């Protein structure tokens, strides 16, 4: 059976489970697998860029809706200046000691689902964010994504292990978990190899949402 679309993935999971009573919850298994995959996989195909302009006097920067993890944040107006991540305590300390001064942002921290910048931008500031993005979730209106096309085994075994609560002491669950772990490890390793092999990597460019 081909495994290149959401419909084909659901059919394959149903075949592996061989349980007619679980058909309705298979989409939930896939959703749970995607949540776990977003935690487990760091692949160059998940890298994306988002560029924009931060308004003067606004210390809080919006994060893209599909953001998982920051690789690098830098300013792009005149040359390139990296904005470094610091802890919330360090941010609070800087603002307390320097009375929330304004200037060119040099640091950021995570605050309430946003990036808090320091110093607060004194002028409109252009930036570019390089980050790890979430998978495009599969659904009836989104038949595939790069992971399903490249590594359908990750999706298949990831979904199957989330059927465990319905299968009691089924020995297959442990096998599926091993297969999932091995597939994830190979995918992450292949990504690291590609990064250092001179392969041409192309990033997706997203606007802030």
Positions of the model-derived regions?
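Glycine-enriched, solvent-exposed interface loops adjoining structured elements
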Residues: 1-209
């Amino acid at each position: 059976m081909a495994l290149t679309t959401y419909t084909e993935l659901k059919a394959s999971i149903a075949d592996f489970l061989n349980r007619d009573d679980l058909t309705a919850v298979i989409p939930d298994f896939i959703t749970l697998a995607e949540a776990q995959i977003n935690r487990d996989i760091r692949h160059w195909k998940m890298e994306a860029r988002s560029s924009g302009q931060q308004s003067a006097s606004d210390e809080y920067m919006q994060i893209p809706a599909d953001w998982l993890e920051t690789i690098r944040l830098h300013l792009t107006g005149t040359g390139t200046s990296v904005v470094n991540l610091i802890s919330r305590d360090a941010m609070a300390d800087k603002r307390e000691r320097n009375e929330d001064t304004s200037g060119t942002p040099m640091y950021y921290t995570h605050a309430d689902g946003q990036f808090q910048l320091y110093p607060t931008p004194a002028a409109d500031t252009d930036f570019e964010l390089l980050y790890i993005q979430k998978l495009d979730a599969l659904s009836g209106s989104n038949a595939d994504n790069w992971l399903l096309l490249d590594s359908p085994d990750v999706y298949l075994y990831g979904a199957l292990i989330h059927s465990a609560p319905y299968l009691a002491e089924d020995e297959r669950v442990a096998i599926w978990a091993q297969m999932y772990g091995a597939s994830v490890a190979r995918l992450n390793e292949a990504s690291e190899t590609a990064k250092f092999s001179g392969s041409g990597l192309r990033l997706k460019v997203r606007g802030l949402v």
